[in-house]
Regions:
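Non-catalytic accessory segments adjacent to catalytic cores
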Residues: 16-33, 66-178, 246-249, 266-268
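Conserved hydrophobic core element of enzyme catalytic domains
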Residues: 296-398
Length: 398
């Protein structure tokens, strides 16, 4: 799924940003008349949106959806990237053009440009611009993040000590580093490389936040929901030791329970499968998949209730957040927040924004975090964050 341009933009730095976006999205019917500007505040209408069977990009032998019944057409989509915590900015938007390729069918959903005399010509024009070759970064330079390696290790040591005193059961410490390129970073290049190198992850690029997340916060389709919880990490090839590590198994149990307990309140027939070993090119994780039937809650209600999970914050949530505010001298922004999409039917996917970087001009800010337990080793936790930064570094060819 690819969105080009913006027909409507919603931004919020409020603690209830997810709820605000849900209310605005539900008050924005696809058939509403177009507003006079390309951005709107919560509650304002979105441009009229309509799915259009698109055949112009089909290659010989590929299926096209021209003969699909109208009921099979996808509905308009809202993309969103939410902050880890307020007052960092959350952003959501309806693309001017959304391209969906599913089950051999290609659809173009237009918003705004759907009012053009020739919508398919507008689609072709947008695609022609998007097909320009991605710019390859060169002459990279690397810089320290908000905390030096020594400062971060010291904070981990202090956090583990606080956990041993009973301040919380687990807390997550994040860190960052910077990469600079004189030509700037082309998000399309990064996304293409991540897709090649990490195909089993959920790749995303939303408002300059680009990544390849292995962790699905919540997905909904046709009344069923699923979530993938990750906690407990080791180097590739060390999975058996991870599977028998009391520290990592306890960390994973806390993360899995933080998701299951919320879904049990809001969904039906909750079932957990795991933990199992999830091997990725850069790390191996303990993973649990959770499935349920959707009740009366909307997908964005589940996103708001689940975030932040123990996998990115800690547990108990409020106690862990206090430790993060005290000891983590890194502004996460939208790193480790929910990122994904939702359509007008309430179906969608929201991953946790992990293994990602924020592109801003000539700077790319990379993020990673580690779950800290009372017996955590600061050196091992630092090594874990370095492994988690590999996807973006691999994409850059470093």
């Amino acid at each position: 799924m690819v969105g080009l341009g913006r027909a409507l933009t919603l931004e919020s730095a409020a603690p209830d940003a997810i709820a605000q976006v849900r209310r605005a999205w539900e008050a924005t019917p696809a058939s509403s008349p177009a507003p006079t500007s390309d951005a709107a505040r919560p509650g304002e209408a979105t441009p009229a949106s309509s799915p259009v069977p698109y055949t112009g990009a089909a290659r010989p032998g590929e299926a096209t959806p021209a003969s699909f019944p109208a009921g099979d057409a996808p509905s308009p989509v809202l993309f969103a990237s939410f902050a880890f915590r307020s007052p960092a900015r959350s952003v959501a938007f309806v693309p001017a053009l959304t391209l969906i390729d599913e089950a051999g069918a290609r659809w173009a959903i237009t918003a705004g440009i759907g009012q053009a005399p020739d919508p398919l010509a507008a689609v072709d024009a947008a695609l022609a611009e998007a097909r320009t070759a991605p710019r390859v970064p060169d002459s990279l330079t690397f810089g320290q993040g908000s905390m030096s390696r020594t400062q971060w290790r010291d904070s981990v040591q202090a956090m583990a000590a606080r956990l041993r005193e009973g301040a919380a059961d687990k807390a997550v410490m994040a860190r960052d580093m910077t990469v600079r390129c004189s030509r700037g970073f082309d998000e399309r290049f990064l996304l293409e490389r991540l897709s090649d190198l990490y195909p089993s992850t959920w790749r995303f690029s939303v408002d300059s936040l680009v990544g390849a997340s292995p962790e699905m916060l919540i997905a909904a389709r046709g009344g069923t929901v699923s979530s993938r919880v990750l906690a407990g990490t080791c180097k590739p090839g060390e999975g058996q030791a991870l599977a028998s590590s009391a520290k990592d198994l306890r960390e994973h149990e806390l993360a899995s329970e933080s998701v299951s307990s919320i879904l049990e309140r809001l969904c039906l027939d909750v079932r957990a499968q795991g933990p199992f070993l999830l091997a990725l090119p850069n790390v191996t994780h303990l993973a649990t998949d959770i499935h349920a039937r959707l009740g009366a809650a909307h997908l964005l209600d589940l996103v708001a209730a689940l975030h932040p999970t123990a996998a990115v914050c800690g547990t108990p949530r409020d106690a862990a957040m206090r430790l993060i505010e005290e000891l983590e001298d890194t502004e996460r922004g939208r790193y480790s927040g929910p990122v994904g999409w939702v359509d007008t039917a309430g179906d969608g996917e929201f991953a946790i924004a992990l293994r990602c970087g924020l592109a801003s001009g000539t700077r790319l800010r990379l993020f990673a975090g580690a779950g800290i337990m009372p017996d955590s080793d600061p050196d091992l936790e630092l090594t874990e964050t370095e492994a988690k930064m590999r996807p973006l570094l691999d994409a850059l060819g470093v």
